Amino acid sequence: MYCVQCEQTMRTPVGNGCAYAQGMCGKTAETSDLQDLLVAVLEGLSAWALAARSVDIIDHDIDSFAPRAFFSTLTNVNFDSERIVGYAKEAIYLRESLKSRTLAKNAAIQVAHPKAEIQLEGNDLASLQKQAQRFALNNDKAQVGDDLHGLRMLCLYGLKGAAAYMEHAHVLGQYDDEIYAEYHRYMAWLGTDPADMNELLDNAMGIGQMNFRIMALLDKGETQAYGDPTPVSVNVRPVAGKAILISGHDLKDLQMLLEQTEGKGINVYTHGEMLPAHGYPELKKYKHLVGNYGSGWQNQQSEFAKFPGPVLMTSNCIIDPNVGNYGDRIWTRSIVGWPGVKHIKGDDFSEMIEQALSLEGFPYSEIEHLITVGFGRQTLLNAADTVIDLVSQKKLRHVFLVGGCDGSRGERSYYTDLARAIPQDCLIMTLACGKYRFNKLDFGTLEGLPRLLDVGQCNDAYSAIMLAVNLAEKLGCGVNDLPLSLILSWFEQKAIVILLTLLSLGVKNIYTGPTAPAFLTDNLLAILNEKFGMRAITTPEQDLQEILSA
């Protein structure tokens, strides 16, 4: 096992990365190794997808399958070895079919790619794990050096994040052939073990640029399906009655759940990154979408244990449900998996709904505690002139974007302390699950504007970017000249690709934490600092002083 993709990976004096029987996330060495094998097979599949495109064969089934299967290898998504092998088998089946059709059109085509012909060597997990070790990500790390290895990981993990957003957009019916072709190019290229530092840096930025277009596609899918989010108050306390909790990012799953539970006397609660769903007109119209439950994903074992109904995981993040003894009440969808947990393959939630009806639900309603969400792209753009007026009148000094992934590391209290310390003449935008560090606090208003603006899910960084671009255009300056600072928290691969997106767009002086990715060496961090001014967080007091005195 070698895995260094998330913020909680092991860090030791002799090297970084989870490398024993089980990773810090709970992923076994078996599952981790099999995910490496799956990635290698997918790299070969992308090589054939490119070859097929050269003879005008575009297979939409492969285009949708490839990033979805890749998504299953992200942190806290799929811990089920059998399902990982299932994805690998399906990838090989699709590859062989595509290969036959491609060669039938042009028998002279050759795909000289090191992973284009991988076959599974055995049917049992032990044999496949042994084969998988040939594709471990650190096999040539000692030969190529830590810097080059780190850049490979930056590209790989960034592309994983982009693949996740591609799947979210695809679920909503969004498809762009140019994006899928570009994805296959990057995936196939990674499979060749690239060894040029400049090429790796350039392609890291290219992956970021591609992801900007993917986020635009996802924004289009969400707003076309559910309308533009508008500000709404959300109750974060339980309401008496039967209950289902839905977590993850997939708004379509939430819509289907709301449709199938309507009129059945079941209250639906959002968890984690589902919180922004309350702002969408076509979702908040359901009266039994009663509120949000819980906090950051890392607290789910204690919070889900107390939830008196079933829990539906639609994407990341899932962690061991056996710790809280709720394994019989948690259900997975799509790419999510945990051994022994019930998985819903189709769109019929009736079995889970029956379970909800059989459980006690909440016995009484607690006193409401309301928070506000729904400051989506259009709402932010509509407020642009107001923001400019407040800046020109010197009533608004600075805007802070404080958000990203949450996690269990104690240093993450920095973000709570920072938000509390931000002066009253400043606005705070937030997004992703990092918001749970402070989104239940009362920040008041500034000239009628809420000081805390919840922009949405992690992918809604697109909304913040579009606001910044709009403000810069109206003010006749660059984005980096705005009174705007980004203080980001990272945990996994979606955060990595959002960072690459921001850097590829030329956004500078980003603060990141709570720690640097373990795959980025001091040399690589120095390069990012020199090129982009990217820096590590220090203390709230020191960082605020530096930002506000600039």
UniProtKB/Swiss-Prot annotation:
Catalyzes the reduction of hydroxylamine to form NH(3) and H(2)O. Its main location: cytoplasm. Pfam families: Prismane (PF03063). The modification Cysteine persulfide is found at residue 405. Signal peptide: none annotated. InterPro entries: HCP/CODH, Hydroxylam_reduct, Prismane-like_a/b-sand, Prismane-like_sf, Prismane_a-bundle. Keywords: 2Fe-2S, Cytoplasm, Iron, Iron-sulfur, Metal-binding, Oxidoreductase. It comes from Proteus mirabilis (strain HI4320). Binds 1 [2Fe-2S] cluster. Binds 1 hybrid [4Fe-2O-2S] cluster. Hybrid [4Fe-2O-2S] cluster binds at residues 249, 273, 317, 405, 433, 458, 492, 494. The gene is hcp. The lineage of its organism: Bacteria, Pseudomonadati, Pseudomonadota, Gammaproteobacteria, Enterobacterales. GO terms for molecular function: 2 iron, 2 sulfur cluster binding; hydroxylamine reductase activity; metal ion binding; peroxidase activity. Its EC number is 1.7.99.1. This is Hydroxylamine reductase. It catalyses: A + NH4(+) + H2O = hydroxylamine + AH2 + H(+). One of its GO terms (cellular component) is cytoplasm.
